[in-house]
């Protein structure tokens, strides 16, 4: 039994919706994923999944943009069989043979076995390699040997927590960005205090590294509080940080994020308000600071 249980929750909707479209637009030659988890999962109809992928699929029926999205098409087909496609499967299906290779990192061997099994059962799949190790150091070590046409999907929970060698996933983003590679980094937080501390840390690190051209999108539950956790649908707020992407991709990220806010306007998670609001850490964008007591 693989221990990863966050599949199909609301943050996955934002992350995977954007990932599929970005990969289709950018068409990388090499795909690298830092925290892969599994390629495919059996759905269990938890309240968190109902608030996540089930709500999205139901509401997307009324939105032509989402109906035409790769994420909707791939998940709608898979969910008919009771399965959710994780990011490794989505990446393989979107990229197909148009990519030279996909590199998947995870600390859990069972997750990597799941990815390899999924790839073997596909009629068309790109060449893949799996790495059962700490992906922070593993990817940092690989970066100099990877082409500029590489795309990194950096998907931890804590992006600024150092590993045993003092390296963080933010270091991975900065290193890859400086090599000219395209990056999509996901992060999460549970309180407004956590968000503000993370935003400050990320902004300062990027500024220090000389990285000023980046896109950011955050979706946050209106139920979030300043310093207390009132509920746990998987995560109360999450963000996507993108570097070296085309303007088309950057615009899509903002557009899709705001459309998600609209389809979640009447959502509920258990007895809590499940509606979302949009924010960003990028001071060049229109920042909305919201008060939560």
PLM segments and residue spans:
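Class I S-adenosyl-L-methionine-dependent methyltransferase catalytic core
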Residues: 1-293
């Amino acid at each position: 039994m693989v221990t990863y249980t966050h599949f199909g929750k609301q943050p996955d909707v934002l992350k995977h919706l954007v990932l599929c479209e970005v990969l289709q637009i950018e068409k990388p030659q090499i795909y690298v994923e830092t925290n892969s988890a599994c390629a495919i999962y059996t759905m269990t109809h938890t309240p968190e999944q109902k608030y996540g992928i089930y709500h999205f699929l139901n509401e997307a029926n009324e939105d032509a943009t989402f109906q035409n999205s790769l994420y909707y098409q791939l998940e709608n087909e898979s969910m008919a069989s009771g399965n959710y496609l994780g990011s490794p499967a989505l990446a393989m299906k979107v990229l197909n043979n148009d990519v030279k290779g996909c590199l998947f990192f995870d600390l859990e061997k069972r997750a990597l076995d799941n990815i390899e099994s999924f790839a073997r059962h596909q009629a068309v799949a790109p060449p893949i390699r799996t790495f059962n190790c700490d992906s922070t150091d593993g990817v940092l070590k690989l970066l100099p040997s990877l082409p500029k046409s590489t795309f990194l999907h950096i998907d931890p929970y804590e992006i600024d927590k150092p590993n045993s060698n003092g390296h963080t996933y933010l270091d991975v983003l900065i290193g890859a960005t400086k090599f000219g590679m395209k990056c999509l980094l996901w992060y999460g937080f549970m309180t407004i205090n956590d968000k503000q501390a993370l935003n400050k840390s990320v902004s300062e690190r990027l500024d220090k590294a000389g990285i000023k051209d980046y896109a950011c999108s955050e979706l946050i539950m209106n139920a979030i509080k300043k310093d207390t956790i009132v509920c746990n649908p998987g995560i109360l707020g999450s963000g996507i940080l993108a570097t070296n992407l085309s303007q088309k991709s950057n615009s899509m990220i903002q557009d899709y994020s705001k459309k998600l806010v609209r389809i979640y306007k009447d959502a509920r998670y258990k007895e809590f308000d499940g509606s979302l609001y949009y924010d960003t850490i990028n001071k060049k964008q229109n920042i909305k600071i919201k008060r939560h007591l």
